[in-house]
Amino acid sequence: MNMPQSLGNQPLPPEPPSLGTPAEGPGTTSPPEHCWPVRPTLRNELDTFSVHFYIFFGPSVALPPERPAVFAMRLLPVLDSGGVLSLELQLNASSVRQENVTVFGCLTHEVPLSLGDAAVTCSKESLAGFLLSVSATTRVARLRIPFPQTGTWFLALRSLCGVGPRFVRCRNATAEVRMRTFLSPCVDDCGPYGQCKLLRTHNYLYAACECKAGWRGWGCTDSADALTYGFQLLSTLLLCLSNLMFLPPVVLAIRSRYVLEAAVYTFTMFFSTFYHACDQPGIVVFCIMDYDVLQFCDFLGSLMSVWVTVIAMARLQPVVKQVLYLLGAMLLSMALQLDRHGLWNLLGPSLFALGILATAWTVRSVRRRHCYPPTWRRWLFYLCPGSLIAGSAVLLYAFVETRDNYFYIHSIWHMLIAGSVGFLLPPRAKTDHGVPSGARARGCGYQLCINEQEELGLVGPGGATVSSICAS
């Protein structure tokens, strides 16, 4: 079975020569083979793929010159195979000031290498392991093994003196090494350009980095195809500032006395801006609150903006409209908790609201025996352009937007949706000017019928006239 590849922040040193035939030197002898004891480690499970291994009387290990130190770490099946096994050695330089000491570490799977004076190489016949070394010049060595094999891993530490490629057994120097071994889900938590995720494939659970902004690698550290800082800043500003297109619809809604609708548009503009400021990868990030809260509020505001606009176009009775607003907010919140990224979260409420709109307009057209809205200007200059803009936005969102073109296609989506609201939002409903309040309340058996243009907001309040008197 092939051994996994290792990841480290520095190249491994050249392997020292085999000490089966020790180099000539004063006081060097060839002692007989010994069976060195294996020191166990304590296992502390913190979370999924998060395990720390501790040694007794550690974390520092004293390495006498006459024998190596061997440690055993056991990785459990399924529970440990989906993470990253990390090993870190740090030499205490003050413990070896008098001699030029190099500490070698050999990490092998299932079979420990008998170091002693026989060999320090990390390979023997069909067995191959991972070699590390620390010295006065290179005090820290790190090794990372993604998706390690389960079973027992053995770490053998041995101190030698001299300068490579020739090493000899030390005389009196006892090297002190700080050892840190742990299992983590991802390499360095994927850094600033990635996110560590738990994945499952065919009942196999494992962790991996999802890199962003063009970064790649096990820990999202490969910048060969990474986006520049200027490009990241441009995409963030474009996604955030495109939400300012909601300002004209907010002003228009307030002037038309659609205060509740204006509040929804303001809510959407605010949370969409800060959600995209927090959603960006890399260092161009600004979060005012938890990411999950910002995402939920952004999605809810977007769907509610579509909902309240279409319901307002239906011109329903105030009580019915308020009930639909509240019911829509509750149902949309439930749908977003089930699946925030589902396409039907947008199409479902939109189609349902369009059904209510079509029903209301059909009933009104049948009662009045002519098309509603009755004026061609309303259709030509408002409804048709607004519908085309909104339809284009939905098509871009559903079929064109990808991960690569997200920053500019989604910015266009912001501007199109906000622009369509300005066309589709109906004009203000006119009041009966000049009619006494008592007459409005009782009517004296009659009902005042206001000109159709006045209802559609195509004439000013000064031009309001009574076109007919109808029996109530």
Curated annotation (Swiss-Prot):
Species this chain originates from: Homo sapiens (Human)
Induction comment from the UniProt entry of this chain: Isoform 2 is down-regulated in nasopharyngeal carcinoma cells.
Protein name in the entry: Transmembrane protein 8B
Glycosylation sites: 92, 100
Ranges annotated as spanning the membrane: 234-254, 258-277, 293-313, 316-336, 343-363, 380-400, 406-426
Subunit structure as annotated in this protein's UniProt entry: Isoform 2 (via its cytoplasmic part) interacts with EZR.
Post-translational modification: Isoform 2 is N-glycosylated.
Keywords recorded for this protein, A-Z: Cell adhesion, Cell membrane, Cytoplasm, Disulfide bond, EGF-like domain, Endoplasmic reticulum, Glycoprotein, Growth regulation, Membrane, Mitochondrion, Nucleus, Transmembrane, Transmembrane helix
InterPro entries registered for this protein in UniProt: EGF-like_dom, NGX6/PGAP6/MYMK
Positions of disulphide bridges: 186-196, 190-209, 211-220
Extracellular side: 1-233, 278-292, 337-342, 401-405
Family, as annotated: Belongs to the TMEM8 family.
GO cellular component labels: cell surface; endoplasmic reticulum; mitochondrion; nucleus; plasma membrane
